[in-house]
Amino acid sequence: MFKGQKTLAALAVSLLFTAPVYAADEGSGEIHFKGEVIEAPCEIHPEDIDKNIDLGQVTTTHINREHHSNKVAVDIRLINCDLPASDNGSGMPVSKVGVTFDSTAKTTGATPLLSNTSAGEATGVGVRLMDKNDGNIVLGSAAPDLDLDASSSEQTLNFFAWMEQIDNAVDVTAGEVTANATYVLDYK
């Protein structure tokens, strides 16, 4: 029994001289979650809800001579589509989708461009949106309806964009080009 008391006493003494252990603050953070429940036959792919398109670089010589840069694909992917079961209230299965692009910053004219809103901006240039057949998209008006494949749960809506000289008589100057557009889908 005396031996057990010595062990207990030694343990008690060692606890007196042991430094408390604290968890070091090795970083912390906060996560914000955002989502939306929609009533539609398809979901927009998460990467295409808030999309960034790199239009690349174009020289002032090229854009002032050709009046635009090279075109870049602007695809909107739809996922988890259930087209045969969707009628959008019409009684007929959904087979098409209309897309309307718009912006609060656009040039004037018959087919406005998205205005360059960059702080270190190039002048005399905007961004043109085009449909899959290279037709100009009129901002604020529905683009031609696109056919949807009822047998597929995934769809890709093809569009294009490029930097375009606003007025062919006024040279574009060098600098950044930034423009923003919103889009709304209308299933039919």
UniProtKB/Swiss-Prot annotation:
InterPro entries: Adhesion_dom_fimbrial, Adhesion_dom_fimbrial_sf, Adhesion_dom_sf, Bact_Fimbrial_Adh_Pro. It comes from the Bacteria. Its main location: other. Coiled coil: none annotated. It holds the Pfam family Fimbrial. GO terms for cellular component: pilus. Residues 1-23 form the signal peptide. One of its GO terms (biological process) is cell adhesion involved in single-species biofilm formation. Gene3D superfamilies: Fimbrial-type adhesion domain. The keyword Cell membrane does not apply. It is found in: Fimbrium. Keywords: Disulfide bond, Fimbrium, Signal. Disulfide bonds join 42-81. Belongs to the fimbrial protein family. This is Uncharacterized fimbrial-like protein YbgD. It comes from Escherichia coli (strain K12).
